[in-house]
Design a protein with these regions (language model features):
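N-terminal membrane-anchoring alpha-helices
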Residues: 1-28
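Soluble catalytic domains of membrane acyltransferases
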Residues: 7, 23-168
Length: 168
């Protein structure tokens, strides 16, 4: 079935590639995404960096057009098993192709979140997304890749401010 309201993107190469790679990794997409013009899609659990990889493959496989919040360092640095910096925006390992990584992350719909100074993020996001007609905003409510006992509440206040549903 076709979803007429859902934010879609025609992908001639990445769509089939996403479907193929999900099959290779023995992942299966089950259920349906509601046919809504605007929604916040909750990405849980997000307790490892590979979660983002599988989410990206699913987005490609379903030909979805999404935006997502990501820690600022993810846009310019490589993941590291060890914490190198105490500054939450400078985690990971610097590398010479940071500019290409940032370009690709932004093209994929990424919105960098500077965690050291994230005050006003929800208010700013409400203002930005109010003027957009059709979108899926993906949020991982854990706020990082660490296992947590309780979700951060930003997704709720964002959905409330935009008067749109959040979908688990």
């Amino acid at each position: 079935s076709t979803n007429e309201k859902l934010a879609k993107k025609q992908r001639k190469i990445l769509g089939p590639l996403g479907r193929l790679l999900l099959k290779v990794f023995r992942w299966e997409i089950k259920g349906k995404i509601p046919d809504l013009e605007k929604m916040i899609l909750i990405g849980i659990p997000h307790t490892a960096m590979r979660d983002a990889w599988y989410a990206l493959l699913a987005v490609w496989a379903l030909d979805l057009k999404v935006n997502f919040f990501g820690a600022a360092w993810v846009f310019t640095r490589l993941p590291s098993l060890f914490t190198i910096s105490k500054n939450l925006d400078r985690l990971g390992i610097p590398w010479p192709f940071w500019w290409l990584q940032k370009y690709l992350m932004l093209k994929l719909g990424g919105i960098p979140v500077y965690r050291v100074n994230s005050r006003g993020l929800i208010r700013g996001a409400v203002e930005e997304f109010k003027v957009i007609d059709n979108y899926i905003l993906v949020i991982a409510p854990e706020g990082g890749v660490e296992a947590v006992d309780q979700f951060r509440s930003g997704f709720y206040y964002l959905a409330k401010g935009l008067n749109i549903p959040y979908v688990p």
